[in-house]
Swiss-Prot record:
Disulfide bonds: none annotated. This protein is one of the early assembly proteins of the 50S ribosomal subunit, although it is not seen to bind rRNA by itself. It is important during the early stages of 50S assembly. The gene is rplM. Gene3D superfamilies: Ribosomal protein L13. Part of the 50S ribosomal subunit. This is Large ribosomal subunit protein uL13. GO terms for cellular component: cytosolic large ribosomal subunit. It comes from Methylobacterium sp. (strain 4-46). Belongs to the universal ribosomal protein uL13 family. One of its GO terms (biological process) is translation. Pfam families: Ribosomal_L13 (PF00572). SUPFAM superfamilies: Ribosomal protein L13. Keywords: Ribonucleoprotein, Ribosomal protein.
């Protein structure tokens, strides 16, 4: 039996929608990253973008376990000497762009490289329950039903 290698022309991409309300950030990000890469498919090929298009709604209503909501710190650098900045998860989730928490969590679970940028383009995160992708007829994925630990009380 020969090793199967998927060609980019043979890729069948589906649209998947995930409601992030009440879900634990890391567990959600892990499932989304696997879907984006296509590792849930039997014809997965590492060097081909064979994953699905993923829409995450209600990203502002995600949960952290333990005391991470107050204590988790996100760092970024301005590019100037001594320009390291930090923000807590609470500050970001209550701020103007709360969807960045989910975006960063997923982004940091994907391998770097040229394919990374293409895969990340298949992720759409929205802070409310509205999204402009109804025409794609996305299939709902119930992450909460996959494992009871995926939902925080």
């Amino acid at each position: 039996m020969k090793t199967f290698s998927l060609k980019p022309a043979d890729v069948e991409k589906k649209w998947v929608i995930i409601d992030a309300e009440g879900l634990v950030v890391g567990r959600l990000a892990s499932i989304v990253a696997m879907r984006l890469r296509g590792k849930h498919k039997p014809q997965y090929t590492p060097h081909v973008d064979c994953g699905d298009n993923v829409i995450v709604i209600n990203a502002d209503k995600v949960k952290f376990t333990g005391r991470k909501y107050d204590q988790k710190v996100y760092y970024h650098h301005t590019g100037f000497p001594g320009g390291i900045k930090e923000r807590s998860a609470k500050y970001i989730l209550e701020g103007r762009f709360p969807e960045r928490v989910v975006e960063k969590a997923v982004e940091r679970m994907l391998p770097r490289g040229p394919l990374f940028r293409r895969i990340l383009g298949n992720l759409r995160v929205y802070k409310g329950s509205e999204h402009p992708h109804a025409a794609q007829q996305p299939e709902t994925l119930d992450v909460a039903a996959l494992n009871r630990k995926n939902v925080s009380a």
